[in-house]
Amino acid sequence: MKKIYYGLMLAGALTLCTGCSSSLLDIDNPNEVTNDTYWNKPEDATAGVNACYSFLYKEGTWMRWLSFRYDLTSDEGWSSSPWIELGDWTRFLYNNYNFYEGNNIHWEHFYVGIFRCNQVLAHVPSIEMDETTKNQVLAQASFLRALWYFQVNLLWDKGTMPLEPKDASYIPEDASEQEIWDQVEKDLTFAMQYLPESWDAANLGRATKGAAKHCWARLICNNISMTRQRNSCNG
């Protein structure tokens, strides 16, 4: 009797195993978001540019260490910190270029911000949506990318300059200081064209035309060749 019982169990198991198709396991994960599945709706464009703004408030940007580095290497402040390496950086004593809080964290967070802007600028143009809203989204991403590259040049006088999304295997080449300034000017020119003068109450805090003009004015002040070019044109 036991032999019959075990035989039936074995036959049933074999039937189940041979009756299942391997394709049943090949299903899409509904929780996995990819570039192919995400950038489809106007709401995706808005959420994408919102993600660009989020890196304005990170430890490597204006939440903490960037303000620390700018203020304490200027005439506006000084450091009496017992943290020797941190104090050295505020006095332009760069003994360790891998010092995370003084250098690496800025590079890391700037380029994550740039990557997010590149995502928006690459994928939003193909979304079917109101053209005015689309251009405003693209203008915000352009402004923020210009802002990040502006910081790259202020701190390092050059850097890499990816302008579209790349995978993890991509190794960008260095761009010169002038190449970065030129790209900043290009992004700001687009931003000044399409950003609004102001936003409604629900969108306060987004970049405006005035913010782009202010950044463009700072660009001219920091870029000697651009200043000379404009002076010669005006003269």
What residues fall within each predicted segment?
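Bacterial Sec-dependent N-terminal signal peptides
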Residues: M1-P30
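Membrane-proximal, proline-rich intrinsically disordered regions
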Residues: C20-S67
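Short linear capping/connector segments at secondary-structure termini
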Residues: P30-T34, N96-N98, L163-Y170
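Conserved, well-structured interaction surfaces
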Residues: T46-N50, S54-E59, W83-W156, I171-E179, ...
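TPR/TPR-like (Sel1-like) alpha-helical repeat modules
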Residues: C233-N234
